Each structure stands twice: as structure tokens, then as C-alpha cells.
């Protein structure tokens, strides 16, 4: 995702896919793992996670790491799973 772009549903789906993989495998992810897997910078991940959290798509333990918000042990919520299902149904 370009640095100057606001997260959209496709960005959320991309990010949620990474969170879901970690959630399902029992190896929760954090900001740095998402950044590495998607090729995004940490500021972009933080921005996307902030919106995902506001939309109740993810849950995670917030830490003091920067750039904020930084989450450890991210999990996908029911709402996040619904977004993934609706996006895959529309694809």
C-alpha cells in the first residue's frame, strides 16, 4: 500500500489474511510480521491496524513500541472474518 494512501477494504483483506494465518496456526502476528509479509512500512501497518481496530476487525495487546499503535498477538475478530468471507464471495 502506498504510504500516502488511506487503507481500503482490499488493504484490510490483505492484512487480515496475514492475521488469520497466524491466528489459525497458533502463532499470533504483530506489526513487524505484517510489514514483512506484505512489504509495507511500519507506519503504513500502524495506520491500517488503527483503522482495523476502530472497525473491530482485529484484537490485540497494545505495546509501547513505535510507530503506534503497535499490537502483539493480533487475532482476527468475528467482524474481521465476515469481511474476509464477504470479500471472497464477491471475488
Language-model segments: residues:
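Short alpha-helical segments that sit at the start of domains
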Residues: 1-16
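Short amphipathic alpha-helical interaction segments
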Residues: 6, 39-54, 71
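Short amphipathic alpha-helical elements of helix-turn-helix/winged-helix folds
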Residues: 15-22, 83
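A short, conserved structural fragment
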Residues: 53-64
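Short, amphipathic alpha-helical interaction segments positioned at domain boundaries
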Residues: 74-91
Amino acid at each position: 500500500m502506498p504510504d500516502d494512501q488511506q487503507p481500503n477494504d482490499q488493504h484490510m483483506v490483505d492484512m487480515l489474511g496475514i492475521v488469520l494465518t497466524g491466528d489459525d496456526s497458533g502463532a499470533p502476528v504483530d506489526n513487524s510480521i505484517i510489514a514483512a509479509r506484505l512489504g509495507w512500512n511500519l507506519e503504513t501497518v500502524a495506520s491500517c491496524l488503527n483503522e482495523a481496530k476502530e472497525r473491530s476487525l482485529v484484537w490485540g495487546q497494545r505495546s509501547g513500541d513505535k510507530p503506534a499503535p503497535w499490537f502483539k498477538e493480533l487475532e482476527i475478530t468475528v467482524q474481521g472474518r465476515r469481511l474476509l468471507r464477504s470479500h471472497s464471495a464477491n471475488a
